[in-house]
């Protein structure tokens, strides 16, 4: 849908199980978690971040339906409802760090994940400096589940999506079609 009209992707009944890695490992959720994903329900990220893996992990899912994004609203919700985990595109974090975070009690927030676009290292650094929280990047598609991620046991490297999800074999290809060596850039 990001390059044209939305396209249908069929999944079978096993698809939700593929999100165990998303909810339990990448989002780092558990039974005491209150998780918010900022995603429209028409986007594949909604089932990624609001439903399958999160419920499998036993987390409570906080759903907020907004017609227009206001960063102060997100910060107020984190404060008022004691949200512990947040997943959003990097653009959301770009707007959050423009707010005066000292006006909000974000002490309940323990873990943040990002997906949907590349993360600017400056946004990562600013958010971490202001909150003490690392932004854990992930990559996947509607047709798959979480394919590459920075998992809780890893130290994030701004500009790197992380490592392959153990559920997948991932190969990065150079422009000539051969596999990229460790440290080389390539296409998934």
Question: Which residues are covered by each model-predicted region?
Answer:
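Conserved AMP-binding A3 loop
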Residues: 1-17
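Conserved S/T- and glycine-rich ATP-binding loop of Class I adenylate-forming
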Residues: 1-2, 35, 78, 86, ...
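Short beta-strand-to-turn element immediately C-terminal to the catalytic PLP-Schiff-base lysine
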Residues: 10-12, 148-152, 173-174
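Conserved AMP-binding/adenylation subdomain of ANL enzymes
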Residues: 14-34, 41-84, 99
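Thr-Gly-centered strand-to-loop micro-motif
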Residues: 37-38, 63-65, 113-115, 161, ...
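Gly/Ser/Thr-rich phosphate-binding loop
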Residues: 56, 83-88, 97-157, 169
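Short Gly/Pro-enriched turn/cap motifs at secondary-structure boundaries
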Residues: 159-165, 179
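Conserved beta-loop-beta connector loops within the AMP-binding
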Residues: 171-188
